[in-house]
């Protein structure tokens, strides 16, 4: 199975993004809906197009979210998710942006990843992992690696061992995600027993 250091539940990941102390850690936006005031704790930039394809606008939006005149969200509460846009990851490292980075990994070999993630054909796995290593070494931050479990595609014990080896030595956590079936993809969600064995 994947190494313990490279696995985390969604709740653990959320906890990692939401420190209760430290610089800015007690800040959080508040939104009002009717008579109830809600504290906005975390923001994840995901599912709205590839954030790193629109780097400058996304960073400007993050700056507004963080500003006291905006939503006053601490940077440690913001996660940016990418399919693996290598130039953007390297730019994040260069600019030392204090946010959390999540990478859609889903496979530990180039052939398997290219079959699941079209962007892997432009930015191969070895280039992606080199960029991730640079990011972690430069910023000192761990990366969250997203792994959507798909029956028969990436959910075997061999796949678990492969991702453990791929991430060995990196400050990493793997977030296992159940596949959400859609009409545009014929993959099947991993069965619960296989998911437990993968962990």
Where are these regions (language model features)?
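Conserved AdoMet/S-adenosylmethionine-binding subsite of the radical SAM
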Residues: 35-198
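Intrinsically disordered, low-complexity terminal tails and inter-domain linkers enriched
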Residues: 2-37
């Amino acid at each position: 199975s994947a190494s313990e250091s490279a696995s985390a539940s969604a709740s653990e990941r959320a906890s990692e993004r939401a420190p209760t102390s430290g610089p800015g850690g007690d800040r959080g936006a508040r939104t009002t809906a009717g008579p109830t005031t809600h504290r906005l704790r975390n923001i994840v930039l995901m599912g709205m197009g590839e954030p790193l394809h629109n780097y400058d606008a996304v960073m400007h939006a993050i700056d507004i979210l963080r500003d006291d005149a905006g939503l006053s969200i601490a940077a440690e509460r913001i996660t940016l998710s990418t399919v693996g846009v290598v130039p953007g990851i390297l730019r994040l490292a260069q600019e030392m942006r204090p946010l959390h980075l999540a990478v859609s990994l889903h496979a530990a070999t180039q052939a398997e990843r290219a079959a699941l993630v079209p962007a892997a054909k432009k930015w191969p796995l070895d280039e992606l992992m080199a960029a991730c290593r640079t990011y972690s070494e430069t910023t000192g931050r761990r990366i969250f690696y997203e792994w959507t479990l798909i029956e028969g595609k990436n959910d075997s014990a061999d796949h678990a061992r492969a991702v453990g080896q791929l991430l060995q030595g990196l400050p990493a956590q793997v977030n296992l995600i159940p596949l959400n079936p859609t009409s545009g993809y014929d993959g099947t969600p991993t069965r619960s027993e296989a998911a437990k064995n993968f962990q």
